[in-house]
């Protein structure tokens, strides 16, 4: 019961924070920031879906090294094991799409910096194209899932007779595959972060001392990505707990509750990278309307008169 309450609180907080951030991006962003607001909207949308699936399944992941079992405790249990397995796959898939979009947003930042602003349609199109492989992969596993397969439940792992248990070859290999993919994608996020951070710092040096507005905007953006680089750390921590359980270094009676909970902190913390380090959104929240409008005007002037450097005036909020 306590575990379900914790999952409910985390899911509600995740949905609420990201819905609020999406509202700010859609309704409170200046027109010069439209591409950036689209990038934020897509990111927060995947975070909302991740949080919703976490509530729907409220899963525990158990392994003794020979098999992987998923124990759902959420509303999906009223719909049957197939619905719970679908929810389990969707949650892991949305987590992966979230990481992939972070990498893509770094690439878009570079594109905005040195080429031009992408259109909203192109951003949405890219987001859809990037999600297709993950959903095809997920659909393949779901189509092969058999809820009637016999499950061997290991002893002394804290599973009770009343628990719904998802297991079998498909559950084991699908969960293992997606967790490995999350780990690899998180590493790619760190590599992309190092690349775009060096790019932004190099660009700031090239600007010179006479373009302070642009350099300030770049500084804000670096702060955003410095905060966001900690988001994959929750994925790493969850994977490490799973590996400890898989190798029997950690007692599964406790660690089975940790993996999904740790994963949930990534979508919960994500909106704070914009709220804390993007002055425009922070001023809106604090009610400093005049300050917010003044900063937007300054950014607009920078955008119109600094040529290539002006592209960065669109980038302070271009963060996944």
Curated annotation (Swiss-Prot):
Q: Which domain of life is it from?
A: Eukaryota
What is this entry's stated membrane topology? Multi-pass membrane protein
Tell me which InterPro entries the record gives. Answer: 7TM_GPCR_serpentine_rcpt_Srd, Nematode_rcpt-like_delta
Q: Which UniProt keywords apply?
A: Membrane, Transmembrane, Transmembrane helix
Q: State where the protein is found.
A: Membrane
The signal sequence is: none
The main location is: membrane
List, in alphabetical order, the GO biological process terms annotated in this UniProt record: short-term memory
Q: Which family does it belong to?
A: Belongs to the nematode receptor-like protein srd family.
Q: What is this protein called?
A: Serpentine receptor class delta-28
Species this protein is from:
Caenorhabditis elegans
């Amino acid at each position: 019961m306590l575990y379900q309450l914790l999952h409910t609180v985390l899911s509600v907080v995740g949905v609420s924070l990201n819905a609020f951030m999406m509202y700010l991006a859609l309704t409170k962003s200046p027109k010069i920031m439209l591409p950036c607001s689209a990038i934020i909207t897509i990111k927060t949308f995947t975070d909302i879906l991740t949080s919703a699936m976490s509530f729907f399944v409220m899963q525990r992941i158990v392994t003794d090294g020979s098999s992987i079992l998923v124990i759902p405790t959420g509303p999906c249990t009223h719909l049957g094991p197939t619905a719970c397995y679908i929810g389990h796959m969707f949650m892991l898939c949305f987590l992966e799409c979230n990481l992939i979009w972070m990498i893509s947003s770094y690439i878009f930042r570079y594109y905005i910096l040195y080429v031009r602003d992408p259109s909203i349609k192109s951003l949405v199109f890219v987001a859809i194209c990037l999600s297709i492989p993950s959903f095809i992969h997920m659909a393949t596993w779901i189509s092969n899932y058999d809820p009637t397969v016999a499950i061997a439940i290991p002893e002394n792992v804290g599973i009770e007779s009343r628990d719904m248990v998802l297991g079998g070859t498909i559950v084991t290999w699908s969960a293992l595959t997606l967790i490995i993919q999350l780990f690899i994608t998180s590493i790619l996020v760190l590599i992309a972060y190092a690349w775009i951070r060096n790019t932004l710092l190099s660009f700031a040096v090239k600007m010179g001392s006479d373009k302070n507005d642009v350099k300030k905007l770049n500084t804000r953006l670096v702060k955003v990505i410095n905060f966001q680089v900690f988001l994959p750390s929750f994925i790493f921590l969850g994977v490490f707990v799973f590996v400890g359980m898989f190798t029997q270094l950690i007692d599964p009676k406790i660690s089975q509750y940790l993996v999904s909970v740790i994963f949930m902190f990534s979508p919960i913390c994500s909106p704070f990278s914009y709220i804390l380090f993007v002055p425009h959104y922070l001023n809106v929240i604090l009610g400093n309307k005049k300050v917010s409008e003044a900063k937007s005007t300054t950014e607009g002037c920078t955008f119109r008169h600094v040529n290539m450097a002006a592209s960065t005036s669109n980038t302070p909020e271009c963060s996944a």
